[in-house]
Amino acid sequence: MSGYTPDEKLRLQQLRELRRRWLKDQELSPREPVLPPRRMWPLERFWDNFLRDGAVWKNMVFKAYRSSLFAVSHVLIPMWFVHYYVKYHMATKPYTIVSSKPRIFPGDTILETGEVIPPMRDFPDQHH
């Protein structure tokens, strides 16, 4: 006996039809995909509305804003961190960038100005 039985033929026909319907269902209509509206941050919404008409001067303002934002976030703030670290964190090696200022006592002379520190006032009515 060669060929398919009537039950096998029916089963194959139904599978082919099911495959055809499945493939047809995979085709998107012109209205698909339906995406939800994109949520924008307030600043992003401002720039989107600002640049909508495409004026040249508005594009220049936006480019200046972007470059200044880059300069602040990638140059200025890291430089502040480096400056803070160098200024306020003493290294373990001697003769580093930062050194503690010497103590000043009454009668000492300040080298830069030549000023003499006056003696401390005495408060006889108070007990220290």
Curated annotation (Swiss-Prot):
Query: List-wise, which residues carry N-acetylserine?
Result: S2
Keyword Mitochondrion listed? The answer is yes
Membrane-crossing residues? 64-86
**One Gene Ontology term from the biological process aspect of the record:** mitochondrial electron transport, NADH to ubiquinone
Which proteins does it associate with, and in what oligomeric form?
Complex I is composed of 45 different subunits.
- Summary of the function given for this chain in its UniProt record: Accessory subunit of the mitochondrial membrane respiratory chain NADH dehydrogenase (Complex I), that is believed not to be involved in catalysis. Complex I functions in the transfer of electrons from NADH to the respiratory chain. The immediate electron acceptor for the enzyme is believed to be ubiquinone.
The UniProt entry's sequence similarity note says: Belongs to the complex I NDUFB6 subunit family.
Q: What is its main location?
A: mitochondrion
**N6-acetyllysine modifications at:** K24
Q: Which GO terms describe its cellular component?
A: mitochondrial inner membrane; mitochondrion; nucleoplasm; respiratory chain complex I
Q: Which gene encodes it?
A: Ndufb6
Keyword annotations from UniProtKB, A to Z: Acetylation, Electron transport, Membrane, Mitochondrion, Mitochondrion inner membrane, Respiratory chain, Transmembrane, Transmembrane helix, Transport
InterPro entries, per this entry?
NADH_DH_b-subcmplx_su6 (IPR019174)
Q: How does it sit in the membrane?
A: Single-pass membrane protein
Where's it found, cell-wise?
A: Mitochondrion inner membrane
What is the name of this protein? Answer: NADH dehydrogenase [ubiquinone] 1 beta subcomplex subunit 6
Signal as a keyword of this entry, yes or no, is no
One Pfam family recorded for the sequence: NDUF_B6
